[in-house]
């Protein structure tokens, strides 16, 4: 949860006060923490993509854009991965799908994470990132929160650790795939 992430990160930089509603006594950290978590969350989500799947009926010639996929799935689309079920072609650099026949279209796609705002409940917010990405996130947040603190080099230490750990992330969702339909003429 967001609450666990904040506790872990604030404990890492020795700024955790479990008695405080904001979990810290430092007003600068309290003011910036959600924005910095969002930055790292979106950065990691581009590396460790969050997969979703949706199916819906389409008609021949129908154009399916991100808005339709978002309406059907309830998630903000980052990138389309795979389309199946009906013949189709991509338009507008892969952001629109033209159905070449009627039927049930299945779409594998990746989504943006849910943005953390001032009204987000720390106990109720669940991260959609993989466990390996969540393990390194506190280091990235700590590095960014402390980088403006000129009195210590803690920010740099955490930033370097984060960058090193980021290189070791499991690339499973980053692997490309190819589908060949209809055979090949030689």
Q: Model features per residue range: what roles?
A:
Residues 1-186:
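Glycine-enriched, solvent-exposed interface loops adjoining structured elements
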